[in-house]
From Swiss-Prot:
Family of the protein in this entry: Belongs to the ATPase e subunit family.
Cellular localization per UniProt: Mitochondrion inner membrane
Claim: tRNA-binding is one of the keywords in the record: no
Name of the protein described by the UniProt record: ATP synthase subunit e, mitochondrial
Keyword terms: Acetylation, ATP synthesis, CF(0), Hydrogen ion transport, Ion transport, Membrane, Mitochondrion, Mitochondrion inner membrane, Transmembrane, Transmembrane helix, Transport
GO MF annotation terms: proton transmembrane transporter activity
This protein's encoding gene: TIM11
Biological process (GO), any one: proton motive force-driven ATP synthesis
Keyword Transmembrane in annotation: yes
Membrane topology annotation: Single-pass membrane protein
One GO CC term on file: mitochondrial inner membrane
Length: 89
């Protein structure tokens, strides 16, 4: 009788442990799969950004010239026409 109690108690403990172990392995696998999917999405986003940069290169910034309005030889009309010309192109 005592032997049967020990036998069935061991069987029940083994079943509970097996269920717990299976559950933890399943959770670990799901976490690894989520991480893998996330890394894959990051790689796709980086590839898309690189392709966008390749297809649409950044525009060159217009050079800024130092303008001294107090200079007596400064031609304001020429400066304005040059600025309008730069905006038009």
């Amino acid at each position: 009788s005592t032997l049967n109690v020990l036998r069935y108690s061991s069987l029940a403990a083994g079943i509970v442990y097996g269920a717990y172990h299976t559950y933890t392995l399943k959770l670990e696998g799901e976490k690894k799969q989520e991480l893998y999917d996330y890394q894959k999405k990051l790689k796709l986003v980086e590839a898309a950004k690189a392709e966008y940069r390749k297809l649409n290169p950044p525009k060159q910034a217009a050079s800024t010239e130092a303008v001294n309005l107090d200079d007596p030889e400064f031609d304001f009309g020429k400066f304005i026409l040059g600025a309008v010309e730069k905006l038009g192109s």
